[in-house]
């Protein structure tokens, strides 16, 4: 019985921290937000915050991971598909709109997805792991930047941009692959 109460309190605390974070992200942005601001908004003390998170960056990383986990599952191994999944709810959109938070979103997408995507690029192109990783990072950063520019709004413009990016990526991989094949056969 006591464990259920503690778990309920913990869930409540994490919930008010999360709500305070997203409210402040919308109002002042990540760079200007402090742990003290989050605690004031959540009506908790700093000690309580630090029981759950090391700092505001750890909170941001946890919320980014939550947002990525809430997105529809990734089908296939195309980098474009990875970056076409819109945020699952309005709070998560804020992570993509804030300049400082967005940089960490892109970093986390790369960290969480490289293991799945880089071997696929290597197989398709014949590139080394290092070179395939460079292409993967380029594709993630570029796709996310274009989606951000378009406001993640679905529609004809978004669909056209995705088609263009996929054609560009696939054409580039074909060119690299054929270049690699011609060097191998020489």
Description of each model-found segment:
Residues 121-186:
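Hydrophobic/aromatic-rich alpha-helical bundle segments in the mid-to-C-terminal region
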Residues 24-56:
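Helix-turn-helix
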Residues 1-28, 37:
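Basic, helix-initiating cap at the start of DNA-binding domains
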Residues 15-23, 27, 41, 58-81, ...:
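Alpha-helical structural segments
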Residues 113-123:
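Acidic-glycine-rich active-site phosphate/pyrophosphate-binding loop
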Residues 72-103:
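Hydrophobic alpha-helical connector segments
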């Amino acid at each position: 019985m006591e464990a259920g109460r503690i778990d309920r309190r913990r869930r409540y605390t994490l919930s008010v921290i999360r709500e305070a974070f997203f409210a402040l992200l919308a109002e002042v942005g990540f760079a200007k937000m402090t742990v003290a601001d989050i605690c004031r908004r959540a009506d908790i003390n700093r000690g309580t915050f630090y029981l759950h998170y090391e700092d505001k960056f750890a909170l941001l990383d946890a919320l980014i991971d939550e947002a990525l986990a809430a997105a529809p599952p990734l089908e296939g191994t195309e980098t474009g598909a990875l970056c076409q999944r819109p945020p699952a709810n309005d709070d998560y959109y804020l992570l993509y709109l804030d300049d400082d938070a967005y940089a960490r979103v892109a970093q986390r997408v790369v960290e969480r997805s490289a293991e799945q995507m880089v071997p696929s690029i290597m197989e398709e192109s014949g590139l080394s792991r290092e070179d395939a990783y460079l292409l993967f990072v380029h594709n993630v950063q570029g796709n996310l930047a274009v989606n951000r520019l378009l406001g993640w709004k679905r529609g004809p413009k978004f669909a056209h941009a995705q088609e263009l990016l996929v054609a560009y990526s696939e054409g580039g991989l074909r060119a690299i692959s054929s270049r690699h094949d011609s060097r191998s056969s020489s």
